[in-house]
């Protein structure tokens, strides 16, 4: 009888243990499911190409890419091929940049008569035109765009991984900042021809000395408005897509991305975004010192007002410098964006880069020989002479290390002509100390429209700053989810709630079971 009671008691204990084990297994399974759902996501996709690599190992030091024979050796050619080859090129340069590029192009075809270059001019940067052509297998063989747009194309498998074609020593020819802009997951997908960012251009006739803080900016703009009856500032925040506004967002303490549970996620819905939006709203509608221009750049309303002496301050990049130089001459000034008085932080523009990429054979239909010719071309148009020519003709900031050092030497020695250009370029180069890295991850492609839609509604008075901040982040997140760049993040608490609920259901059953056994 005692044996039977002991046996039944052991059965009760074993039942309890089994039930507890079941609960533990369920909890572990729940945690496993959670991490499976939140960890499998493409935060920064890698790409590969099936094309044949031509990387050589003979160049351990940076090669002389101004030497035609060296360029052919870099792509595995010992002599010019007997059959001529044609490469198609999409060019996104401005008119002043094209003056320099056309000189470089003429020199290239003289050095490489077996390569014929068909150029399409005036292609806009950051457009979907290339992607559409690539998916139809009709992309140009060579394409010039910004590093962030290029990153999205590389992640989509539409442009070559140059690290598989060129030795690492080649990439040392460029400024580290510039080549990093063209690197994703350790792979280089383009060769930079400049570095760029926005600065504050001002008319010295109205503003003898540039503001260092936003408080000074407001004060100066009010004085200009009152004294000269022109706009103190022309900044069309409602028209842009967040390229220039990112500088002010950073100045108020914001950042476009953050990381949650290992995922790259948008961080636009923040106090920093609300304050940055409200700042420019106040300058426009409360102080009446900013003109909300309907178009940006030298050819837009902002630039035209500046050229016509109808506004004292604008925010633009060196790519439009030539137009402002011609109009204002020695009255043109350039300086870094001011410190945001509320935070003590500099307004920090994107430090980005433009450069040259090569389409995959699948995107363009290029033959192996055309790929070699394309590699020679992008190496040539980013070499020392070509990059220095862009600096001297269009005032682009060189990405080539040797050209950059020459430009700095010219600047320090005051050799730029006209003489007042030296001070202007000093102000432009100073801005590089206060910038932020331009995100080149695929997620960045979905920032622009998200910002534009809700910033436009905000400045039109349809929504408030909080609603704009929330709306642009929601749109951003939705776009990332739809394009497979973000998985729906499940917060940890539900797992523990589920586990707790299951344990509450099962543990009473254990107790009841044990009680029944004891009664038996």
Predicted regions and their residues:
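Short, solvent-exposed loop/beta-turn-alpha elements that line the ligand-binding surface or hinge
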Residues: 77-80, 163-174, 254-276, 326-327, ...
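Conserved N-terminal structural module of periplasmic/extracytoplasmic solute-binding proteins
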Residues: 54-152, 156, 343, 463, ...
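Glycine-centered hinge/linker elements that transmit conformational signals in sensory
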Residues: 220-223, 262-295, 325
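Long, aromatic- and glycine/proline-rich binding clefts that accommodate carbohydrate-like moieties
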Residues: 335, 392-453, 457
